[in-house]
Design a protein with these regions (language model features):
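Nucleotide and nucleotide-moiety/phosphate-recognizing core
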Residues: 3-114
């Protein structure tokens, strides 16, 4: 499983951290967010919004991410933006290959299925 935290401005990703540490996402997410912000000299109050993937994805992972994002958005008074996982993957494909006409995003269901 992958847990990702990114900082973006406009359409550009300024920095990102991807964790591939098994099932420790709940314990690692908040410190990873803090590390990402500190390494970019950004305070939480500087953020304009908080975005989170809304699925599909791991049930527990989505719950941890959603709860963390919702708590941050609420405590900072910032908007919370839910982004469907497959929509984000399709957009990334088009960003990398602007000549493409179609994209078919898929994720590993961890059961030898997509």
């Amino acid at each position: 499983m992958v847990c990702s935290v990114a900082l973006s401005k406009g359409k550009s990703v300024l920095d990102a951290i991807d964790l591939q540490d098994g099932m420790n996402h709940a314990a690692l997410l908040a410190p990873t967010i803090e590390r990402l912000l500190q390494s970019n000299s950004v305070k939480p109050s500087d953020l304009d919004a908080i975005a989170v993937c809304s699925g599909p994805g791991s049930y527990t992972g989505l719950r941890v991410g959603s709860a963390t994002a919702k708590a941050m958005a609420y405590s900072l008074g910032k908007p919370l933006i839910a982004i469907p996982t497959l929509q984000a993957l399709a957009q990334a494909a088009f960003d990398l290959h602007p000549e493409a006409e179609y994209a078919l995003p898929m994720i590993d269901a961890r059961r030898r299925e997509v």
